[in-house]
Amino acid sequence: VTVRDRVDDGDGKYHYVVNKNETMLAREKQNQMKEKFKEWLFADPERRAKYVDYYNETFNNIRLREYDGSHLQFPGMNPEIELKPHQKNAIARILLGGNTLLAHCVGAGKSFEMMAACMEQKRLGLANKTVMVVPKPLIGQTASEFLRLYPSANILVATERDFEKSRRKQFISRIATGDYDCIIMSHSQFEKIPISAERKERMLQAQIDEIAYAIDDMKSQNGEQWTVKQMESQKKKLQEQISALADESRKDDLITFEELGIDSIMVDEAHAFKNLAIFSKMNNVSGISSSGAKKATDMQLKCQYISEINGNRGIVFATGTPISNTMCEMYVMQLYLQKPALEQMGIYHFDSWAANFGEVTTALELTVEGSGFRFKSRFNKFTNLPELMNIYREVADVQTADMLDLDVPALRGGKAIIVESEPDWYVKQVMEDFVVRAERIRNGGVDPSVDNFLKITHEARLLGTDARLIDKDAPNNPDGKLNKVAENVWNEYQ
């Protein structure tokens, strides 16, 4: 809940500003109403039993399957390489359990798991053509590791030249006509393979319908005009995308992704695709982003296609950091890998997921410029966590460093050494300038294209490293971080 006051600008124009005191009081009342509702819900035994039964039947009905890969044989694998038990179990999950998230820590052997699963899928007839998508710097390493694990594997590796405009059509034709055990390419190359315009249009129209429903719902409840305006703006942007899609004539007439015969996708470092746009009626809540990356939307469309043709199998994501910044990242991973399962539970959009498994909290936080504190609302508290984790673990194979007891060198002294560095007069002066700029941004006194909080945060990080990253003529602080690092490295070297 946010209370805004209308401020007239003259000439019939006006804008809204947040009333901090009234907002605090309204949110306190909101929390009281939530507590009263909980008390009312459980006060009547019959009513309580009704909703407890509904919740258990809908969400608390999962017994997690345990996968044992000890019996697996790997024809064609290098006999000098022996996979560890947790790797065999993960491969068994991929083969038997459908879409999988390999949420394993660094050094757990995710690459070998995907490679072995890829070859076994092909051998068992579970997949005919697999594409392995990896970060650009790892293409060569992935290819050599694949051939080390399976020396006779028939793999196609995309080079940088293969996706140049003059050669792209030829390379994509090789994918369509060749019988490969695995096709290895980079994240950016994978994005250049187009998905059909019809599929894009269906997705955009579904999002527009969802927003239109939410707008009608907000209006019927006399919801905030501010929120309705934001949703109308978002709806208009999506409609413009559909129009652009209809008018678009592809510069190079490539075969679409659906026509390549690919029926399995394996994505290494899958956290690179977590920035998926999420539509929500909640506004001004940190941790929820309505703007997403184009490559994430492209990945979502391709994953939807693979799930459709394979019955919710054929997708493998691998990352050591599936959830690192916000709770929404868990929803995004579920959207990629288990959307039908969510829909079976009546969860068709983010707000429904958030209502069941999350909560918005408001607390005092340090301002961006570090000059004081402000109340900030964040979507950062899980509710019904045991049930959510059971749903998540249906696709997620989680292995932490503690679970695997990996041989990691211990820190000298058992903990990190804190080295303090004092700011000089120049750093303090720039920090004061950040305060002035932040206040101007909050009051709408500067165009966002000229200055914004993201710019201040970026400059503050640079300043925290060394002032000369912002201004090459800034004074050299002898007590600065870089000088401290250089001094410590020299002492260690001595």
Question: What spans do the regions from the language model cover?
Answer:
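Generic structural signal for small/hydrophobic residues in well-ordered secondary structure
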Residues: 55, 87-90, 94, 102, ...
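Conserved SF1/SF2 helicase motif Ia
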Residues: 106, 113-144, 150-154, 309-313
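Pre-Walker A (Motif I) flank of P-loop NTPase domains
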Residues: 97-102, 128, 181, 312-314
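Inter-lobe coupling linker of SF2 helicases/translocases
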Residues: 168-215, 220-222, 226-229, 233-264, ...
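Conserved helix-turn-beta segment of the N-terminal RecA-like "Helicase ATP-binding" lobe
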Residues: 137-163, 170, 174-177, 337-341
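Charged, low-complexity intrinsically disordered regions
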Residues: 1-61, 127, 151, 175, ...
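Conserved pre-motif I regulatory segment
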Residues: 61-103
